[in-house]
């Protein structure tokens, strides 16, 4: 899951236990990251942000996290005024500095019309600042808010899917 491991998702929500019993498993562990960088970029056009994500993806950078959040979601969650789309990009490594990867990702964002929301260089708290930090706080709070909203018939969530780039704009 994009939200990380959680025993309740493995047992309660999956077929495990209902269709059989797990008798064996394995896990691959990585060292805890010592090098981290997060930045945020604002875009006036959602599809420009999507093009920046595509550029980062096709540059072979493999960020630990890259998300675009549209203006409506930012506004609903108190992370923006609805006038911009936010792209959050993060890199992590237990082995080596990530500056070169973050620099290239920033070039991709700026090349596609993004402007810096939160600078990353020499800023270990970038993930807590600006629209990036406000959205992060809302994202972490969302499961608790969902408990209050769902009984009232309000459902607001992120749905992940996969589609080819040439069909993305029409799909969105």
Task: Give the ranges of each region predicted by the language model.
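FAD-binding core of FAD-dependent oxidoreductases
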Residues: 1-32
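C-terminal substrate-recognition/cap domain of FAD-linked oxidoreductases
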Residues: 27, 31, 37, 42-45, ...
């Amino acid at each position: 899951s994009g939200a990380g491991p959680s025993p309740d998702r493995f047992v309660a929500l999956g077929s495990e236990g209902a269709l059989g019993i797990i008798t064996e498993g394995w896990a691959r562990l990585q060292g805890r990251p010592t090098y981290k960088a997060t930045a945020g970029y604002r875009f006036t056009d959602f599809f420009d942000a999507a093009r920046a994500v595509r550029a980062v993806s096709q540059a072979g950078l493999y960020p630990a996290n890259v998300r675009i959040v549209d203006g409506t979601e930012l506004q609903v969650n108190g992370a923006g005024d609805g006038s911009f789309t936010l792209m959050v990009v993060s890199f992590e490594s237990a082995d080596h500095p990530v500056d070169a990867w973050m620099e290239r990702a920033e070039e991709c964002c700026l090349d596609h019309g993004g402007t810096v929301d939160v600078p990353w260089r020499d800023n270990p708290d970038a993930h807590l600042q600006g629209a990036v930090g406000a959205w992060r706080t809302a994202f972490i709070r969302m499961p608790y808010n969902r408990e209050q909203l769902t009984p009232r018939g309000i459902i607001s969530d992120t749905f992940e899917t996969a589609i080819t780039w040439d069909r993305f704009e029409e799909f969105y």
